[in-house]
């Protein structure tokens, strides 16, 4: 008897691809054959094949924000992508199709529905993306990382790394700590400039004895400018291009200052770390603010818009934080973790395939 087959559709950003890979790994451990529908010229082309997963090519990208000329081409591009997707599905004949977001998922999802192949959709963000808003109407099951995102949605969480979920409870990690607060700053690859400039300036406003210990990750491209910013501010910091062991970095931190992508927010909850979210202001539909509110509305994190993140505000805010308060916030964040999200999403895919057989 041949192994059941799933076709995962996700592309464009790591926020769609990485959770899809987590589900793929669970299903492969259960004996499934996993294929991936994506654009080989985009991020999925770099991330998926090294994991031993065959990338089934489909070249399609969104036109939102690309101007009138791109919008006029959309019907032709979509028709061509749908024809490609139909042929791919006819060749593969998957038992179930899982859409994790990104424009490439739209033609594949529509064609799966037309072929009566079970379609499962998972939305990572607290505001659904364009493709998933449409595909949710066609899907057998609709899943989400946060509550109340889509009609018929089941909030199963976002798949996160096991090493984050395995960290000790915040009370155990914070116990016995003394001295300066430990702050981890993660700028990310998008829009890191605001954090990279504001944090050094804010720390310079604090008395030297009141400054926290800082580890600041900014990406290789931004590292020289970040080091210069701290030097000009007269502030010592551990500046890094990358952090190889993010779980350990989070475990050591009293406070994380970061953006609010869906996976970041889910990882904060999984790790149980106090976080100040500064949402990327140009994210589509301002979805990062909605993501951050999942924790900030529960007093399990703080949210500060970038427009009002000044060095003066941040210096005053940091000066008011205590380790005891940060531990309490970290503990509340941990209560919102859904550590078995990948397994639960895989369960739903298996259920959808069985019901169709």
Curated annotation (Swiss-Prot):
Superkingdom to which the source organism belongs: Bacteria
InterPro entries xref list: GlcNAc_MurG, Glyco_trans_28_C, GlycoTrans_28_N
GO cellular component: plasma membrane
Main enzyme class: transferase
Segment forming the signal sequence: none
Family to which the UniProt record says this protein belongs: Belongs to the glycosyltransferase 28 family. MurG subfamily.
UniProt-annotated location(s): Cell inner membrane
Binding site for UDP-N-acetyl-alpha-D-glucosamine: 13-15, 125, 161, 189, 243, 288
Catalyzed chemical reaction(s): di-trans,octa-cis-undecaprenyl diphospho-N-acetyl-alpha-D-muramoyl-L-alanyl-D-glutamyl-meso-2,6-diaminopimeloyl-D-alanyl-D-alanine + UDP-N-acetyl-alpha-D-glucosamine = di-trans,octa-cis-undecaprenyl diphospho-[N-acetyl-alpha-D-glucosaminyl-(1->4)]-N-acetyl-alpha-D-muramoyl-L-alanyl-D-glutamyl-meso-2,6-diaminopimeloyl-D-alanyl-D-alanine + UDP + H(+)
Protein's GO biological process: carbohydrate metabolic process; cell division; cell wall organization; lipid glycosylation; peptidoglycan biosynthetic process; regulation of cell shape
NCBIfam families linked to this entry: murG (TIGR01133)
Main function: Cell wall formation. Catalyzes the transfer of a GlcNAc subunit on undecaprenyl-pyrophosphoryl-MurNAc-pentapeptide (lipid intermediate I) to form undecaprenyl-pyrophosphoryl-MurNAc-(pentapeptide)GlcNAc (lipid intermediate II).
Name recorded for this polypeptide: UDP-N-acetylglucosamine--N-acetylmuramyl-(pentapeptide) pyrophosphoryl-undecaprenol N-acetylglucosamine transferase
Gene: murG
Keyword list, A-Z: Cell cycle, Cell division, Cell inner membrane, Cell membrane, Cell shape, Cell wall biogenesis/degradation, Glycosyltransferase, Membrane, Peptidoglycan synthesis, Transferase
Primary location class: membrane
Disulfide bonds: none
EC number(s) stated in the UniProt entry for this protein: 2.4.1.227
Gene Ontology molecular functions: UDP-N-acetyl-D-glucosamine:N-acetylmuramoyl-L-alanyl-D-glutamyl-meso-2,6-diaminopimelyl-D-alanyl-D-alanine-diphosphoundecaprenol 4-beta-N-acetylglucosaminlytransferase activity; undecaprenyldiphospho-muramoylpentapeptide beta-N-acetylglucosaminyltransferase activity
